[in-house]
């Protein structure tokens, strides 16, 4: 189960055009987004370490998204 709250994902699905959203669908989307975000975060951390920094900066996230 995702650590992120499910309600924002229900809103995202409705904003995308869904009239109704099952809890399971919102939970599944939350899990998928969390997995993707974790991979981006891991890459950003590695980029910060490579730059000899302990702080992850916006540019690390941007670079991670490009990879």
Curated annotation (Swiss-Prot):
The keyword Signal does not apply. The keyword Membrane does not apply. The record marks 14 as: Interaction with DNA. It is found in: Cytoplasm; Chromosome. Keywords: Chromosome, Cytoplasm, DNA-binding. GO terms for cellular component: chromosome; cytoplasm. Pfam families: CBFD_NFYB_HMF. InterPro entries: Archaeal_histone_HMF, CBFA_NFYB_domain, Histone-fold, HmfB-like, TAF_TATA-bd_Histone-like_dom. It comes from the Archaea. Residues 20-22, 54-57 are annotated as: Interaction with DNA. Its main location: cytoplasm. One of its GO terms (molecular function) is protein heterodimerization activity. Homodimer or heterodimer with another histone. Dimers then assemble into higher oligomers, with the DNA wrapped around the protein core. Binds and compact DNA (95 to 150 base pairs) to form nucleosome-like structures that contain positive DNA supercoils. Increases the resistance of DNA to thermal denaturation (in vitro). Belongs to the archaeal histone HMF family. NCBIfam families: archaea_histone. This is Probable archaeal histone 2.
